[in-house]
Amino acid sequence: MGGIFGTISKKSCVADLFYGTDYNSHLGTRRGGLATYSSEKGFVRSIHNLESSYFRTKFEPTLNKFEGATSGIGVISDTDAQPLIMNSHLGRFAICTVAKIVNKDELTQLLLEKNMHFAEMSSGSTNPTELVALLIIQGKTFREGIENVFHHIKGSCTMMILTEDGIICARDSWGRTPIIIGKKEGAYAASSETTSFPNLDYETAYEVGPGEIVKIKADGMEQIRPANKKMQVCSFLWVYYGFPTSTYEGKNVEEARFTNGFNLAKTDDVEVDCCSGIPDSGTGMAMGYAAGKGVPYQRCIAKYTPTWPRSFTPSNQSMRSLVAKMKLIPNKAMLKGKRVLFCDDSIVRGTQLRDNVKVLFDQAGLKECHMRIACPPLVYGCPFINFTSSKSDMELITRRIIEKFEGDANKNLEKYATTGSPEYQKMVDEIASQLGLTSLKFNTIEQLVEAIGLPKSQVCTHCFDGSSAYTLNEFADED
């Protein structure tokens, strides 16, 4: 997915920029970047690969190069190298994005036909952030340029632009990914995650709306473009992406996860000895489930946090498998002979869960393994956010099972996505069988949306029900 952070201050911003960006590290594992501005040095940039190390480890030794900066932006990226520094008729600026551009090749060709050129490459193709920057500089103003991005791309794009006199923050026009503004005396900040704010003494001041453009300076904030009326914020922020202490649209992540588990327990008739979460994003749900069910919450599986990152996002499948195997350690003393219900955020490929379940039975002596999932089955690929490193919908376990049953992975998707239908139940039973589970239940869209606490019309549930295909165009038509 990726996360961005920016800050502007009446004094040095370097420490806040460094730590604020680091607090977005759970959103990506591939690259990190910082760009700053000072009247003495101008724009300064640094980018590092994070696949073999952490953000702080890579950037801390070189922070002195940013000395004296009073404004800056940072990014944790799962795709391209960024931020980029551009020189144009709009002036010099640095830009970072959280974006997925489905029609990237088409737009690249369009710009090449206009005699524009690309200097950056990302994994052998156009750098999406440079593509966005080139669309921006076609406008007469930053507002016009950003609206040009919204009108042209399919997918989503949230961005921060560092100029000589401030930081421009633009949220994607359907509001899928957040930007929250924080403030403290003499400084303003913007972040994908409110988690960045408390330890840096920022208070949440404002949440940028869908398609809204604001500019922050050290002494205040101004609106450049008003927010759109419609919103489709990504439900997976509360299911998986979000850090427990973060809040989006006024709805806290951990609170939603706890409520999700609590409500699911009230409708579940399984008998178990205890409940446990698959760390980290299954933990809050498991605590809620245990409270709702009236059974003990126990840490039957522990995550070795000092050195092992998330296994969801590494681009290499063998690395994902290695991380998944090494990071989770079963506690045999709490598992042997027990009936345990586990809570997890989602099932994507199913490979990690299948291997973990086998270990629980074969090595830890588990008697029964019941799995409860925070969201409905993932039936549709996400065209809006870099949800996983998957290149094909066939990496989804649901699609492989549908192909097994129907002979066509794209047939009768709506039936399989409908909770309670014969096709749905047949698919869930097959998933449970393939993964070796005693029982398996997924949450419903209705219960998930209720736990989040926003109206269904404002929450994107496309990966569960395919309902948001009409919003593929980034530009939100208010008519």
Q: Model-predicted segments: where are they?
A:
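Conserved short alpha-helical segments that host acidic/polar catalytic motifs at enzyme active sites
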Residues: 1-209, 215-272, 278
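Flexible loop/turn segments at secondary-structure boundaries
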Residues: 12, 103, 176-177, 197-198, ...
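Short glycine-rich phosphate-binding loop at a beta-alpha junction
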Residues: 28, 270-281, 285, 370, ...
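A glycine-rich phosphate-binding loop feature that marks nucleotide/adenosyl-phosphate handling sites
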Residues: 37-41, 164-166, 277-285, 292, ...
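A conserved beta-strand->alpha-helix junction
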Residues: 122-130, 297-310, 407-410, 439-452
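PRPP-dependent phosphoribosyltransferase catalytic core
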Residues: 165-166, 201-207, 358-479
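Extended, hydrophobic alpha-helical segments in both membrane/secreted and soluble proteins
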Residues: 275, 282-289, 293, 297, ...
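Short, glycine/charge-rich flexible loops or terminal/linker lids adjacent to PRPP-binding catalytic cores
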Residues: 294-340, 350-351, 379-391
